[in-house]
Amino acid sequence: MTKVPQGFDFSFLNEEEARKILQVLERNEELRRAEKDRISKLQKTKRDIRWLQGATGEWFEEIQRKKFCNETDVNQMLKPPLTYRLQKGMAKNDPMELQTPRSKSLINQKPSVSSRMSFRSSFASLFSFRRPAKETLKLQSPRPNRCDERVRPSASVRGTASAKIYNSPVGNQPVASVFVPKPAIMREESGMPPPWDASLLESEFFQVLDDLDNKLAQEQSSGLMNTRVPFNYGSRTQFKLSHRNSHGHSTGRQQNYHSETSNMSIYNILRPGTPREGFKTFSPRTKTIYDMYRTREPRVLKEDFMQKNAFGSASLCFDSRQRSASPATGSFTARSLHFPADTQNKSSFTPVRHQQSPKRTPLSSIIWNRSDASRHRQNQEESLGVQAPMDIDPEEQYVSPRCFQESRRYEMCHSQNAYQSYPLNVPVANAMSPDTLENSENMPFYRQSNPFARSFFSSTFRQSREQRFGQNSFWSRQEEYSSWSDFPQSRGPFPSSDKDFEMFSVEANRAPSVCSQGVPSQHWRSHSSGHGTYVFRGREDSHCWRSDFQTSPLESMDTSHVNENQHPPHFVTPVGFSITDSSCHLQSSRLDSQQGYFPVEEAVDEDPYLCGKAQTPASSFRTPFPLSPDDGRESQSSSFPDSTATLQKIIPNKPDFLPIRNCTEVPVACSHSTDSLSLTDTQPNIPVTETNSEKDMDVSVSKDEQLNKTGQKSRPTGLPQYVLHTVISNDLPDFQNAHSRDSAQNDRYGFNAPATERSRRSPRVFSRKGTSQIHTTQRDQSNKLSKNKCFGGDRTLDSAASPPFIQESGTATSLPSPNQGCHQKTGSNEESSNTIKNSHWCFESTANQKSQPSREPALLDLEQSLSTHSTNDSKLAPGHSISRAPLHVASDAPQESFLDARLVPSTTVFSRSLSDQDPGQEQREEKDKATKSQDNQLAVNSTDNQESHDSPALPHDAVHCHPYSPFKNGRGKGRVRRRVSCIEKLTKTERAAAPTREGSGCAEDQRSIKDPELSTVYCTLPRKPASFLIHSRQQESKGTVASVRNGPLPFQIKNKAEVPTGKSTSDKPSSPESVSDAANAVSGTPKATKKMTDMKAIRSASVRKGPLPFLIKRAISCPSGEPCSLAESDDRQKSSVLGMDASPVIPRPGGRIFNSLEGEPSFRESAFSEKELAQEHTGKDRELRAPRMGLFNPSKKTPERLCATGSGKESGRALHKFKTTSMFSVSGDEENVNCLEVVSIYYTLPRKPSKKFCSLLQQYTQGTDSLRDAFQGETEALPNALEIDELNCPAQVQSGIPPPQDPKMQVDSAPCCLSHSPESKDVSQLPDRETSKSTLEEMTSVGPDVSLHREEPTTKEISPSNVSKTAIDDSLSREKREKELLRQILRAPLLHQEKGAGKEHTKSHQQPSKGGNSGPSGLPSRSEDNDENSQTRRDSGTCAGGMASGNGQYPWRDHMAAVVGDRSSRSQPRETSGTTGSDCQNPTDKMLSDSESQAFALTPALCKLQLAEEAQPGGAGLQSEASQAGSQETNTAEMRKVEDEEHMLTRDQTLLPRGNNKNKTNTDETKDRYSGKHRLAAISKASKRIPAKDLSPRKHVATIFSQSESESGFRRLSLYRPEDNPLSPEPTVKATESTDESSQMNVDKSETLLQETTVSSPGPPGQPCHQKSASILQPHLNGSPGVLETPPKSEGSKTQISGELGAPAQLTLTSPLEKGAGHQQRLSPPFPLEPTQKSTINSHCQLRHRSAPSPESEPEPHLYRSKSLKNFNVQSDLLCASHPPKARGRHFSENTSIDNALSQLSLEDGSFPNSGYNRRFKSSSELPASYESESWTSYSNRTRGPKSTSSISRPIDYGIFGKEQQLAFLENVKRSLTQGRLWKPSFLKNPGFLKDDVLNASNLSQSELVNSPAGQAPEDGVFPSEPLNIYKDDPVEPLVSDWDTDTTTDDEYYLDEKDKESEL
């Protein structure tokens, strides 16, 4: 074992690897010598030989010697018997065969085999025999197969091509003889002992297995490969990975799998179980089995090529590659080591296995992977000729394999959509391997989650591939296509960071792309329809597409390869990188396929342009603008050579245009090509192909594949996948059909028909993913525009605009693709963005700017409603908006239907959001093009993204990922990252921003500087959490600024459009007249306003873009629900016109909740739609009674006010501040983009006027809802339904409203998720505030002020806090004044109006709530409905009503909704909870106004309010209402105090009046513990990177509040176990899930319990309980912020307010209690009550979380984050969800984040304990999304609650901050300690010490108790659990404490802190 055979062959190893191995061997020899010396000395001295042997351990060696006569390897020793027997049997069977292939294989492996075997039989023998077996298989099978396949590119080619390509390097041996040579040669070469050559025996043994497998594979592959099943993606994913090595169709495949097995062999070698796992028997068996399944995989060929080329072989040995250039380097590399993981990933079981392989991983990944990977990358970069360890042989490389390799990689990526993170990195097969190896345990998500890994792999392997394949245009192109736009961009910018995100983009792109491309069905369909080609978008797109045309994928791919190499090579050659090449290739391929597909059977590869000629009429509309943009872009992309030649032809121009706008423009061409081609060819296949080319390929294929594949494989990924596959199912059939019909109809029919069809397709695309939707919408818009304008250029423009979205949408990865495609194609993000923007706007901007005056008025009438709504698509604005408007008008119902059918609410809405992101963006984009070009040159991506269609694409990517795309953007991060790669290079903020936009709205994503930053953060967007996180972040950035921009302009438009839309929407949102009226109103009346808003939009272009995605996302979450989804989708489409948005929502969702959801999102979307939202909500409530009326009147009223406030006030600051923040976020967060972005957003928001900030906050809240919707709509869309079911909430599941409620839940969740994003807190508060504000606004004519007021306190953290924080340094006092003024205004009219309106709405809501509880009004009864109702109620001032009505059921549901919609709806649930008390209805309204005033007063103390408001976000209004007088004044005074002294904040919050602040702070703190930790880390980084002014308040808030409040909270938790107990039940539930989730859940559960307690005693008892809860919760909230805040809101407005504002609430209810003895009384007197109630509620909640864990557990963390510190916690959740991309390094961090969103919703406890509690691998609390390392550990710490805070030890977090903050923190700590908060020592020293030890025991019992009561309580509404609660409170609290104070968390946190610091 120790002795190294003489002939050890390291040829399969890198030099470094071999060196390391040799070093190990040498050291082993030295050790053996030393041991022998020692033994010899002992032997000399010792008497007894036996004793001597026993002492020396020689006895074991002796036994081994006796056992195995040959002292070879342990592996050999272990294996010889079996191997020998097998050898005998094999010798009988295939003596010659075994020897021949072995010899052949050993020819390459000879030295390595012998050396290996000598080195270690386990390692070497397994490796050698495996590798030889693999090589043998590959060598023999590949050559004949390969030749055959090459020769025959038909169906056989597909099956055979894989083997052929793979085998081509091997190429010489027949398949039959493949197995023979290995054993003999192995024996000969390995130098193994003669008795039985372990290598030989193994080889022979596996030879037999291989023969069997080969035969099976051949049979299967011959039969099945030709009949690839498109939906075998789940299996094919793994199979794909398997196929990475198995290029031979059957034998090659199985051989490859053997190779993969050989790869696994490394792991097998590394660990004792090698014989079992290392044996080819198992792996090849698996391969055979998977081969059987693989036949389903239509991409075996592609897979093989891709795998082989991308990874050489997935297996360690990489026979074909190894044989070729550098077997030594190519065989045993990090990648090869990774490939066992990759290989495992290929097989479904393999990924798990790979994760199980960590035992081997250390050797493979640690020892070889990193160095080898780095060296590998260098080598690859250094010389193209030198094959990296995993590189493919040149043979394979330039044969079809590259295409297939990329395709296969892509396929693998997508097929592993469940492991989207993994597949995304897989796109670069090489990248995938190292990542796999790097994080074996995290392999599936590591690539995606680890930006660095991604970067490394992308860089290392893509560069290597570039070098390897750089010579081949096709490969570079294909590689780029594999990476999609990102690949081009990555390659353009450069592989290092670009590729990092390329990988992600591959993730993102590929997940959808792979879905579309990797889906065998599509592939096979592609044969007929060219869909399969698009299955492999970039790599295989043209090739496979042509192959599809030719029905011979391999041949087609080869031909395509050649042709593409001919055409794209021009691009590639000029580009050098495959940027343009890939873009061109992708686009060329696509266009070739798209345009050439119509002559499907023709030589499309070279004729695509000829085909384009044939399609010239169709192309003509594209040509006008695309030609010039194409030319410019192509020249930029250096696609111009081919592009020029192509440009000569219209369609070639289109492809050129496509190559130029890789994702954006190409899809445009594709879209129009589809339309044109559909028109020209009018073939459903062609439209499908075209659609596939542009959107179907991306969207339809992606959708279908994702739906189908995601259905199979996406479920592991979580909701993002679910969204994808939900969409896909519809999309492929429907979308294709719709596309075929739509394309034909659109082309044939004029504006209306395409609008209808397109809208249909758009919904499909939307449904398929936000991205798809946007693409469809854009296509529809561009088609409609073209037809509307009769303007080929414009249509092309829109087509270009649409296809980017389509492509971006089509591929989750596409999102970065547009950014990178557009930007990277251009070469630089800015230039590309500008180019895209200009190209876009060449036909769109020029059309927009030129024809916008004319077209906008004309189109605005129709489009205005949508234009305002579609302004978010401002990039596409005119065309897109126009398209959208007609689309909405013409096919509003169809879209609704499809959206509804789609059930991709967040995606659907999201796409629309992207489409209608900027109602005024068209106009604004004209200005913004210039202004934003300048402004966004800072955030080049942001500006360009905003202006370009990239922006819409980004969200699609994000959507796709998490949802998605993960999901949408479940994998969004990767996609974003790919897109961000260039952005990342420019700025990390931009990159992060891009992902956010990606998640939120690509259109806005690119408009917002936050986009790029978000891109980085959300690169995991394939993970849904990431997507929504990006959304959140993007919408935090975008939402903030965009809400201002959206608000005033959209608000005006909305108001004007809303009036018509109110009617139209109420009647039928789809009525063109309404849209036209709305558009006219928007276009006509708000023309000046629009100009103003445009100017303002230019300023806050990024901001403007953000909210719309929120709105859309919010709407999307509604679409997630059945009616809500459609309504909101349509509303989102008409989101610009809020009235339209809200009105349609009202009728469809069955009224108010929908409207509330929509109104809220719309209002949030509108910069100052708060008032309108409130009015809209009022209108909604009335619309329940009188649908149009409420919307109508408030709409008129609010617009002016909001416009004046938001437009006038906000226009000045929003953009600049926001941009700075954006930039900061980008630069701040590479890994922790979210956190930095959060800080950025915060700082950006403070830079905006408070009103604007409030408006932004509202929008952001809405966007948060939307984002949360997008994320949770995607991740929760399913989970929401699951939640609803799982929640056991009859009301929730009631009747038809549950779907709306579900959407609403998603909407709520979306805001919360959004809040979880960088501005998690702010967003968190924002939904609540916005609801509160909306309620106030709605309730009062002072609504805007009220809304602002409430929002200010509520948005204090987000909006006022950040807007005021923008003003905190510059307008803090002004905000204070504003707040006071608003408070005054609020107090008088708001209190009365809100009281009246609140009562009215409360009654409205209450009636529905009660009815909903009963079941008639499913909305309130449902948790989401309750959330929405509570939100609506809060919006409409019915905070108390809804909760009061549904107290028993509702509070629980509300809480559940809060939990389910935790991210977005937690705040709202809190508000709902707050609203729960009907007794407090009026007091709630009054308190709301008071609280608003108070919050307004608090606004000046934004830093303090930040956290305080986070505690108060949901209950800002409610809490304010509840604690209007004392809380108001106290809070105002306190907030001022806090503002004056940040440390005073903690003290103030400690004080009675600080109860609110404290609660907020505690909530914030807990969230800070969670998200605050990461956020603080990010903030600390931000403080280092952001101006102290901007950062300081926020950071201060985070630091102080997180620290002092966390400390105080922890102290309180320690002191007030009852509070902790409520948390404890939650932790009990979530402790399983995740300490992080536990804390959140505990808080949420506590809140829920309190809510339910309040429900039990909504009146004074509830309030006292709530006050107690608040008091306890405040302390407890410090530990678990969410608890305090949630219970107050749960308990009712008063209770919620008291809980939120603590003292004010208690002032209201128990004024002396909270006020006089604030904390002490809260500690003691309230404590018993509250603990009881809280415990009861917590038990209920916990049980609910457990009983309905999926809905409740997730919402609960969200509730916790959303409610108490919605910003922090929501941020945490959002960040976690979004950060999963970052957390991809975690095992399941990315997937877990998405899964967390999903799991919390659907799997909840079960998932969370595994996922969430799994070291809180960021997934549990979605914090993983926040930061990979930081979020992971920090999140765990935060999850740990007090300990997390303690472990954060605010000083540490603080240390990241400045000394100033540290001092403030210390002061806060001192104040907390001195002022009687929870004792500081336990908090500081070991928050977990007390809690773990003292609380742990009771924790378990409490947990159990809570579980049982919780199980009962969820149904009962927590009342039954109340007594238990008191009993359990103490145990529960320890649970929380324990959960909060996990030692691991502490360490993790510190590690994270270090990581953060290092990152900083």
From Swiss-Prot:
Domain RabBD, chain residue ranges per copy: 7-63
Modified residues (Phosphoserine): S799, S802, S1027, S1083, S1117, S1493, S1724, S1739, S1789, S1819
Residue ranges of the region described as Disordered: 325-366, 616-645, 672-720, 734-835, 910-976, 1035-1095, 1291-1375, 1389-1493, 1510-1759, 1828-1847, 1906-1960
Compositional bias (Low complexity): 673-682
GO cellular component, one term: endosome
GO molecular function: small GTPase binding
Biased composition (Basic and acidic residues): 692-707, 921-932, 1318-1336, 1392-1403, 1534-1546, 1561-1571, 1951-1960
Function of the molecule: May act as Rab effector protein and play a role in vesicle trafficking.
Name used for this protein in its record: Exophilin-5
Species: Mus musculus (Mouse)
Species lineage: Eukaryota, Metazoa, Chordata, Craniata, Vertebrata
Gene assigned in the entry: Exph5
